[in-house]
Amino acid sequence: MKKAALCCASGIGDGLLMMIGARHLKLAGYLPTIFHDAAEELSLLFESDTFIPHVPIEDLENILNRYDRVLVENDNSERAWHLFNLRSRGRLKHLTFFFPTDSKNIREGDFLFNPKLTVALNLSLACRKILGTPATKENDLPLPKDKTFKKYLKRIIIHPTSNDAKRNWKRKRFLSLARRLEKEGFSVVFCVGPSDRSRWEGIEGISLPRFGSLKEVEEYIYESGFLIGNDSGLGHLASNLGIPTLTISGNPKRLRLWRPGWTIGKVATPPFPLPNFKGINLRIRENFWQNFVSVSRVYQAFIELANESCRHMF
């Protein structure tokens, strides 16, 4: 069987999304290997697939030449630029890049995403074009065993962090939102990673369960009713499991592309476009967007999501 490699960006969400490509490669007759920084965590979710941590840049040419086809998610990292260079010099000719945004490095055979569609849908269309497989967003994520889908329908998971602090809504607003939701009869649980836990443990009155692995987080999400959070990987995981999501962000343009794209979801963004004055280093959209997304705005978006979710159940 022909062998293929997928080179992912660093986020958990990127890994889940690129598994769409892995499924298409299987349909096209390839045996895929997925390169990702969180290879060990993702392998617990996709037990029948092969994950390998990214190799040192100096080893890329030797390692990737062992594969018949290589699909790369462009993240403008040092690794991606090294691969651009190797391809332009004819050292790695079998590379195909997925470009979320336009780039001078696009070559014939690469795929530029449509910014009006989700990444999940873009990847399914890219694979149809590149591999000739039917367009589908399925990534073969196995559902948790011995768990009940949406068992706790009124349980809301709030994921208040991300891998970029500038993407995070204000902590005090997450807490205010939680109190408001609890008054409406919902059970609210906060979910944070080990590195963020110390900032949240001392807050009185919140539920903050401890999880031993991404697999345990997945199982907990699967039995919950909703997930609310920033633009982060857990939103993609919830959507992948069929759990409705509400994503809070200051960048509507980015979110049109990167919002969770497997099941129903809503977004909460500022009520009007925010500028970035780069010349005077006043990046309002980047650094101050949180001030323009109120608790009431997010709460209303959640009520709309909950109502839509109810309609989908019948």
Give residue ranges: language-model regions.
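Catalytic machinery of carbohydrate-active enzymes
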Residues: 1-314
